[in-house]
Amino acid sequence: MSVEERPVIFDDQSELPKVFVGGRKSKLALVQTQHVAAMLKKVHPDYSFPVLGLTTLGDQVQSKPLYSFDGKALWTKELETLLLEKVPGFDQQDIIVHSLKDMPTVLPDGCELGAILTREDPRDALVMAAGSPYKTLADLPAGSVVGTSSIRRSAQLKKSYPGLVYESVRGNVGTRLSKLDDPETPYKCLILAAAGLKRLDLGDRITGYLQKPDMLHAVGQGALGLEIRQGDEKTKKILEAIYDKESTLCCLAERAVMRTLEGGCSVPIGVETKYENGKLTLDAIVVSVEGTEFVECTQVRAVEENWEAEQLGKDVAEQLVKDGAKKILDAIHLENIK
């Protein structure tokens, strides 16, 4: 890592004690990181929260679909280095802000998940090209091209809409929308996370929402996860004021499903959670890449503690394996090795 990466830095230069908050350099990531810093400043006015925006491997390599990457730390490794080490030219970070769906379920030694914040809309959004007469995927003519780099999305949609064509589209949200609206575009629509569009004030581009039975969202989608150094009790205490219990229980259950199944960006695992009256409902699905095979499981349980949410996720994953998910996942792993 070198200073030539030209990070983005926001620092009020105050004399207050500093708690350094880092995140990715993309527009959406910076919006999210600055949002977290503002939340923290509101509840801890006696501290300063400088923001760092850094380019990660996932930002640098735009020519490959996400599922072709074997690594599970595609968006996090460089930032975790700054959390754990003193790197020349950089301030050591105290908090790293992640879109939780991009955060590996097994963190590097020395790191821990310090807090999960109130979740934004976790659903996937359908975005039609500007001026399109179509309102739903069912409206599209056979052979229409749907843009998504998520194997989870394409696998589930192939199950419900086998007559459509699914092609990768990379880039930040603005770049993807520009590709969609280009008169020469091959895409009829895109599938994007609703939360990201809303955080960028692009909610008006949402044509509709995808949900059961057509689509279960990604693990942790719509939530922000804050990574800290393991054992950093001071920072953990600072984060207590912005932690959200309901979002935490839901997301921990979802992450336990993926951790138990050993999944990452290259595995089509979808989830949906709901927490009401002390009961957590967890629905999870594993789908083959072509959408021809799938296994789904739903369980409901009284949950109050984090460990109970994680146990629910583990139990759902184990039931999926018993029902045939391992066969689907093994086939995907073998295909990725080829």
UniProtKB/Swiss-Prot annotation:
UniProt cross-references to Pfam families, sorted A to Z: Porphobil_deam, Porphobil_deamC
Cited InterPro entries: HemC, Porphobilin_deaminase_cofac_BS, Porphobilin_deaminase_N, Porphobilinogen_deaminase_C, Porphobilinogen_deaminase_C_sf
Keyword Transferase attributed: yes
Pathway(s) of this molecule: Porphyrin-containing compound metabolism; protoporphyrin-IX biosynthesis; coproporphyrinogen-III from 5-aminolevulinate: step 2/4
Reaction(s) catalysed (UniProt annotation): 4 porphobilinogen + H2O = hydroxymethylbilane + 4 NH4(+)
S-(dipyrrolylmethanemethyl)cysteine PTM positions: C265
The entry's keywords: Heme biosynthesis, Porphyrin biosynthesis, Transferase
Cofactor: dipyrromethane
One BP term from GO: protoporphyrinogen IX biosynthetic process
Catalytic class of the enzyme: transferase
GO molecular function terms listed in the Swiss-Prot or TrEMBL record: hydroxymethylbilane synthase activity
Cofactor binding summary note: Binds 1 dipyrromethane group covalently.
GO cellular component, one term: cytoplasm
Listed EC numbers: 2.5.1.61
SUPFAM superfamilies: Periplasmic binding protein-like II (SSF53850), Porphobilinogen deaminase (hydroxymethylbilane synthase), C-terminal domain (SSF54782)
UniProt cross-references to NCBIfam families, sorted A to Z: hemC
PANTHER family per record: PORPHOBILINOGEN DEAMINASE (PTHR11557:SF0)
Note: The porphobilinogen subunits are added to the dipyrromethan group.
Entry similarity comment: Belongs to the HMBS family.
Protein purpose: Tetrapolymerization of the monopyrrole PBG into the hydroxymethylbilane pre-uroporphyrinogen in several discrete steps.
Protein name: Porphobilinogen deaminase
Provenance organism: Yarrowia lipolytica (strain CLIB 122 / E 150) (Yeast)
